[in-house]
Amino acid sequence: MFLGMPTLTHEEQQKAVEKIQHLMSEGMSSGEAIQLVAQELREKHTTRESVSIVFDDDND
């Protein structure tokens, strides 16, 4: 699976982590929180440089 993710500064990464932790503290699952924050980041950074991420879905 390939995903385009924007490159983030350390500060942006830290804010994303804090937002995910906050959402989880309010009862959202970790997967949902990560998905929500990732989507927000993609929308916010549509014009910035991005990197391709490859997930190996094989469960050997």
Curated annotation (Swiss-Prot):
Species whose genome carries this gene: Proteus mirabilis (strain HI4320)
NCBIfam families in the cross-refs: PRK05114.1
Alphabetical list of HAMAP family matching this protein: UPF0181 (MF_00507)
InterPro entries noted in UniProt: UPF0181 (IPR005371)
Protein name: UPF0181 protein PMI1604
Family statement: Belongs to the UPF0181 family.
Classification via Pfam families: UPF0181
